[in-house]
Amino acid sequence: MLKSGLPRCAALAAALVMAGGLQASAAEPGLSADSIRIGSFGALTGPGYLYGKLPMNGVEVVFDEINAAGGIHGRKLQLVREDDRCDAASAIAAIQKLVHQDQVFALIGGGCSNATFAAREAIETAKIPTLIFASVHDGITQPPAPNIYSAALTSSIESEAQVLFAQQQGAKRIAMISMRDAWGRARYQPLIEILKAKGITLVADEELSPDANDATAQVLRLKAANADAVIIVLYPKPAAVYIRDAQKLGFKPLNIGQSGIADPAAFEEQVGVPGATQSFRTISQVKYTPEDAAMDKWRKLVEAKFPGDRLSVYNLFGIGSAQVLIEALKRAGPDLTREKLQAAFATIKEFKTDVHPGPVTCSQSDHRCHKSPAWLAKEPGGPIRVLGVTTVEN
């Protein structure tokens, strides 16, 4: 009797252990034996949809591919979207809904920087693992919150890359034109500090409002300063106004953009003046253009799932970020918890996605995992070209 009881005791003990493991998993919000619910926040409507809806579409096609292959440790990924309308209050409300009502396990998102920055406290308080896919505000990841990582470039990394690019192109008289809202200041101040550290004095420092319809005065001052390179810290609309007026007034410096103007083809159309973007160069978070043959696979998947859409550089933001999230989920293992996923992000080193210009590396002390912006150019009427990559060491 004693011998026959031992196997039963062992079986009972094993069952209790398994039940305990299942209960632990079940206790995690958004997690079941066969699914992981991931929340995403960003603008689904209005002009900010470029940084919200389109990256989310990229995330979703990656999730579909993973799910078709069996999921992650047997769990399928589900994406729950919430519109933050590129607005601070709406972003906070979106986080609260995803965390408390939708009960998601983790977050991937963040489009408009001002909105995401406003939501940082809500994300940190919720202790939910979060990966940013587009927002660049330094304050989102610095100082590091334990649960927030970024697969996007940050404003200080882009700012340093802009200065390095100007120097690499031989510029001697560097100027700047910028917005001074929260988004603009997040880039402007790092630029000033970087220029100071390099011993560079701007020959002109101009401000242009986000809703400006004329930049004649700013262009005339930049031209009078004989600037040979102008660092642009503007949204696409005011940047287009500046470029149009520069062309009209015969001012043709090297114009250096950033990821807020990440689609040179769309920007050329927005400027609407033949030849005006001839000397415009801009930063991209990804190393390929949507037309590149290397993106054929993703083009087919995006355009099949979202009929009428064409593959966009903003879809690629989501694709690369989703691959980083999936790598972290794999590393966290089958006995998944939020704490394990959070810890897994910090172990990602030299990870190559299908779209990032350089390897993605995260650490406990630095949650800015992407530091290798690519440079794009587009000859008027011609294709977009990738000029190279600048890796920032900071």
Residue positions per predicted region:
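Stable alpha-helical elements in mature extracytoplasmic
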Residues: 47, 51, 55-62, 91-95, ...
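Extracytoplasmic "Venus flytrap"
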Residues: 28-60, 82-89, 111, 177-185, ...
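Immediate post-signal peptide segment of exported/extracytoplasmic ligand-binding proteins
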Residues: 25-40, 71-76, 166-172, 335
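Segments of small-molecule ligand-sensing domains
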Residues: 304-315, 326-384
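Short, low-complexity disordered leader/linker segments with a strong preference
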Residues: 1-37, 68, 391-394
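Extracytoplasmic ligand/sensor domains, especially the bilobed periplasmic-binding protein
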Residues: 89, 103-206, 255-278
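Beta-alpha junction/loop-to-helix N-cap segments that form part of ligand/metal-binding clefts
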Residues: 35, 50-57, 68-142, 208-215, ...
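Extracellular/periplasmic periplasmic-binding protein-like sensory domains
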Residues: 243-318, 378-384, 388-392
